[in-house]
């Protein structure tokens, strides 16, 4: 699931979700649509199945992209900065869906700068810089006692930005 949604603009939401299960997995339209409707209900988008992507908010499009991927019954889901292109108000609804998937035991690889979310949902953190793995470990270890200078610098900068924003709001 990518940050740019990759929905087909000329197809309604139901058709966007059911295309791959019908064409790739050779599932019947009836079966694919029934599952798509169940998945849309899980992400609170039942009323959008006949809508086109241009009619949806960024958060809604991202949830449709997640549903489309889930309709293929993946063993592993890759989320590549799925909240990067969203307004702050829309980020929460997408992260809630991913959190629910985590609680259901779906294996996920999540590329994100949403550090508090990563800390809450991850079994393992892999910190990368310029395409290289700098550090890897359990979330609590990474966030409380990073092993590398690069990870410490990154976290210190993140904490500084978070404190600055908090101070601006209280002023």
Give a label for each model feature:
Residues 2-130, 134-136:
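ABC family nucleotide-binding domain
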Residues 140-171:
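C-terminal boundary and immediately downstream tail of ABC-type ATPase nucleotide-binding domains
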């Amino acid at each position: 699931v990518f940050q740019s949604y990759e929905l087909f603009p000329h197809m309604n939401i139901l058709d966007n979700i059911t295309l791959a299960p019908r064409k790739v997995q050779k599932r019947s339209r009836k079966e694919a649509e029934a599952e798509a409707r169940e998945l849309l209900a899980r992400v609170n988008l039942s009323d959008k199945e006949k809508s086109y992507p241009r009619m949806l908010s960024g958060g809604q499009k991202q949830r449709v992209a997640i549903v489309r991927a889930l309709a293929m019954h993946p063993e592993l889901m890759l989320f590549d900065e799925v909240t990067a292109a969203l307004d702050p108000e829309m980020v929460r609804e997408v992260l809630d869906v991913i959190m629910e998937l985590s609680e259901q035991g779906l294996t996920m690889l999540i590329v994100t700068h949403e550090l508090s979310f990563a800390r809450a949902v991850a079994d393992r953190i892999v910190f990368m810089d310029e395409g290289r793995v700098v550090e890897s470990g359990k979330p609590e270890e990474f966030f409380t006692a990073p092993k590398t200078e690069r990870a410490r610098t990154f976290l210190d900068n993140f904490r500084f930005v978070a404190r600055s924003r908090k101070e601006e709001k209280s002023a």
